Amino acid sequence: MSQSSKARLSTDPTVFEAVLNNHTPMMQQYLRIKAQHPDMLMFYRMGDFYELFFDDAEKAAKLLDITLTRRGTSAGEPIKMAGVPYHAAEQYLAKLVKLGESVVICEQVGDPATSKGPVERQVTRIITPGTLTDAALLEDKRDSALLALLVHESTLGLAWLNLAAGQFSVMETSVNNLTAELERLKPAEILLPESLNLAGINDRVIQEKLCVKHLPAWQFDTAAAVRNLSRQFGTHDLSGFGCEDLDVSLGAASALLDYTRLTQGASIGHIKGLRVEREDTYLRMDATTRRNLEISETIRGDAAPTLLSLLDTCSTNMGSRLLCHWLHHPLRDRGLIQNRLNGVSFLMGEAGSGPCLSVRDCLKRVTDIERITARIALKSARPRDLSGLRDSLKRLPAVNNAVAGTATTSSGGSDVSAHVAALIHSMAPDNALVALLEKSLKEEPEVMLRTGGVIADGYDAELDELRAIHNNCDEFLLQLETREKARTGIANLKVEYNRLHGFYIEVTHAHTEKIPDDYRRRQTLKNAERYITPELKAFEEKALSAQSRALEREKLLYGELLDMLSQYIDHLQQVARSVAELDVLATFAERALALDYSLPLFTSDSVIEIQAGRHPVVEKQVDSFIANDVQLGARTGGRRQMLVITGPNMGGKSTYMRQVALIALLAHCGSFVPARSALIGPLDQLFTRIGASDDLAGGRSTFMMEMTEAANILHNATAQSLVLMDEVGRGTSTFDGLALAFAIARYLLEKNRSYTLFATHYFELTRLAEEFAQVANVHLRAVEHKHHIVFLHAVNEGPASQSYGLQVAALAGVPDPVIRTARRYLLKLEQEALSNQPQGDLFSRDDLFWKQDRMPEGSVDKNDSAPEHPVLALLRTIVPDDLSPKQALEQLYGLKKAAEKE
């Protein structure tokens, strides 16, 4: 910041006043307001433009790609200026918010015609990434959360607010869970005490450009928090919310509330309470697991293909946002899960005969009631918001008709009907509310209130009169002219209007003797006189001001309408929640029918049994998908706790593991699952250690990241956790990696006792099954022909025979000479391993294999002789009498696929 900039924003009154004296009155006004918001861009209203000055102008010009100009001077330097049109401000604001900027809106509130000096201006609202409510600034299908954090000793207090939905939540956890909570909540903006410095926050600010604001520490005072929050909720205390023991998170909530009030410049009356989240409410997932499962974002940061992109066919934006929330917050309460599953079952009906499609069709015409309700509370709802709300409320009874009979016992059971019926009952619109909206609004109101045409005819007598004057001006003049001709007997009398003289009656000089006494001369012309009468004068005053007065009257009536609608905030929020939930349940039903999903079953036994499971996302990306079983937990002969998974690269190990986790996640969300059947015991957490990545900003290598993730799992996994471990130890030397992988596997078996899928290329780990009864080996099959590999993607019992790494390298396009050299080195290593001889120096120039690398062009490597056809190789391994019908069919598909690739 330049010295002149520091002086303009100085907190020293003497310095600041000295700076002001060098500026015009208007610029003094600007600087006084700007000094209150030094760290934000300020849109300063001047006529039809929002202007920015000094450093704000330079910054905005770069960010928005707008012209940087000058206006006057300051301390001998030109004042930089940039501006955007008032009517197009939203598109510029949206861009700034996406870049993480906050913007102060300073409006003209005085009348330029009556102002002496600069027009009075004041800040009407502050737009920040976490406090958005305008439809033009928000993503339709994504929530925008404001998060406040406070730390006391090892306790992390969180409070977050979705202002556009009126949802306010708090929770407390260990400070070690900061990264996991940031990944779960995905806040648009974070508030911290000035004294708090969190490493996890700093890392993410650098990596993801998070918007972080530091507030005075006193705003997080826990002693004052209860009073502040109780005053907002209109309660004596907070005992009704179950948060008496959450002092740290309440301090964060109080600071968040104050910040939100400041930004809105209006009451936030739709924030009527808070919800307490406990750590055991949801199936927990750390940040790594959420990323690896690609729930709503791919590893590369794309929105598709993900689990959310596959499932989100919701009819409403409210439903889409709730679906995303459900996928990131799988429930642990079996009763709540069963309620959702019952609802889905009912909406599907027998053989797809349920009402889900008709419900979805009705909901497609329902607007975003949730966000409109917030804008009503904040007095920022626009006319089309209200007309959309009116039309949506009128359509909701059709949903009831679509699910007629849900209040009685259906084929799915009485509980099914009761759950859906409860949602239908909760979304029934208040008749008085609908009547008010119908009576007050035009059928198709104008987009903006400033243009008028919003309030319905017949709603207000004064407005009707003003409109009649404005709209029927010509008709009145013709009627007056006819009456005056009859009264005076002057046939050529005219009643007319012009901008300079207003309304007048024109009479030629030949008829001046017939002029009545109530005519008053307004203008003399060469051949005529122009007059005005008391009646015409009164009409003129009304007509000339009718349009502006009508607009002011509409604004007044619209404000009163918003006040009346505020009485229905609780009702509208309940309607919105019910519509969103019914939408998600109907979407689950539609997806289950379209994608052939089945109803998951839950048990109190420690077991995960899935028959013919599929990866929900991958199966839609390929022509055919091989379904596979998984069995973990209690079984005859003991508890099958760990599967050691071997097989070739690209053989499907990671897909197999992920599909197990995704099936478990979907079941806990209340969705049907991509499997023939699924039986799931109690789960508390999902963990994944999959893939390779580094953290350059944090100074952590790929192997360090891998070990950090493994350490987190070993410290936190329980006997009710599902753990996916993929190729642990590959980031270091062979022996180090193998030793670590073996030790980690044993720790998971003996200490954590978690359900574990352990994929590896260390075939030595398959010996765990010999040492531990709770370990089983499975592998994904592949066959080779002429050094080409065919992946069968079928999971079979027992360990794999080899990894097929060279064949996969060839598929990746590694040059043939490299593959041939690698094959010879591999042969030597295998021979040495079999002969139990010390490993030779593969890279010595005296080595036989180094010399063979220089074979004459066109010569044939004897090791390249072709083995038998892969289909024949596979057929030789099949024992028909040992195959079930299902396994035989899978083998047949594998043979066909192998044959087609030849």
From Swiss-Prot:
One of its GO terms (molecular function) is ATP binding. ATP binds at G647, P648, N649, M650, G651, G652, K653, S654. Keywords: ATP-binding, DNA damage, DNA repair, DNA-binding, Nucleotide-binding. GO terms for cellular component: cytosol. It comes from the Bacteria. GO terms for biological process: mismatch repair. It holds the Pfam family MutS_II. PANTHER family: DNA MISMATCH REPAIR PROTEIN MSH1, MITOCHONDRIAL (PTHR11361:SF34), DNA MISMATCH REPAIR PROTEIN MUTS FAMILY MEMBER (PTHR11361). Belongs to the DNA mismatch repair MutS family. This protein is involved in the repair of mismatches in DNA. It is possible that it carries out the mismatch recognition step. This protein has a weak ATPase activity. This is DNA mismatch repair protein MutS. The gene is mutS.
